[in-house]
Amino acid sequence: MVSERSSNQSHPLDYYMNNQSTDHHTIAEDLEIQLTENDKQRIKSISEQIEPLNHEGLLKYGANLQQKMSHFSHQILDDVQSKDMGPVGETLSQLMGKLKSVNPNDINPEKQSRLKRLFKRTKASINEVFSRMQSVSSQIDRITIQLEKHKDQLTKDVEFLDQLYQQNKTYFDNVTLYILAAQKKKKEILTETIPQLREKAHQTGNQMDIQATADMEQFVDRLDKRIYDLQLSRQIAIQTAPQIRMIQNVNQALAEKIQSSILTSIPLWKNQMAIALTLMRQRNAVSAQRSVTDTTNELLTQNASMLKENAIETAAENERGIVDIETLKTTQNDIIETIEQTLQIQEDGRQKRQVAEKELNELEKDLKQHLLAMRK
């Protein structure tokens, strides 16, 4: 069904995925329409392998194909479980974190918030910013290497899943042929074999002929159940197809996201940081030039002011005498006041001594009187 189908002829699984509303009856009809001559010959050959009343052969009919499909399902499950997408998401998150850790606005104080300027130095050294950018850039380069490995692995996974999808198509085609072959054999038994057995049993009335008819009817019932089992296997193949495509799409989206980050986000970040650093240097140069101009103007203003003050003070000093009249007056008043205070102090001392002498005489007289009184 696959090898001989023309390139412009859609595979039933592809048609099913693009037309989710298609029912099983329509799919079956499409399968019959798309059968090639080789498919019809294979159906005939497989149908002839079914021996009526051979229950062991019926049990093994299509079993090998179902075992391959079971192994195929486990293969898909193992592949999904072994490919943990967690590290990919973590690596992308790390990349976004590093890209956000150094923002061009952080370098430009004018674009920082008032609160941020309050708790952070207004101006950062160019060397500090450049060193920080180099450190982050090195970390981003290491993350980029990891992302490249993830992207390569995801690309390989997409190719591997595409191979699994093609295998699933092959399983679908084969199980469909087995179903059609079993249905062909069932129709042959119902329309030819059983009517012949019934006619023979009716004519002979032999109990063994009647039992042979019943056995054949039981065989048809078991054949019908086997067909149903194979239809379930085909349904698994139908459901597996969109699951494989879904995993492929997720892997492809992640690979594209990684490639976009490597080829777009990272170069854009580096360009913006280079531009921000250049603008910072320009701003610092303008600030330095402004500082030189302001300092020059300030020095000229201060020198002119000092020259004016010195000229005025020098002229005033030249007009003054060696000793000011006011100074002489103050000095003379201080001398006179000192002499007067000295004379007053001497007079006060003299008076105090006279009073002390009188008190001493009184004390001496009092002592003598007490001594005389003690002798009597």
UniProtKB/Swiss-Prot annotation:
InterPro entries: Toxic_anion-R_TelA. It holds the Pfam family TelA. It comes from the Bacteria. Belongs to the TelA family. This is TelA-like protein SE_1089.
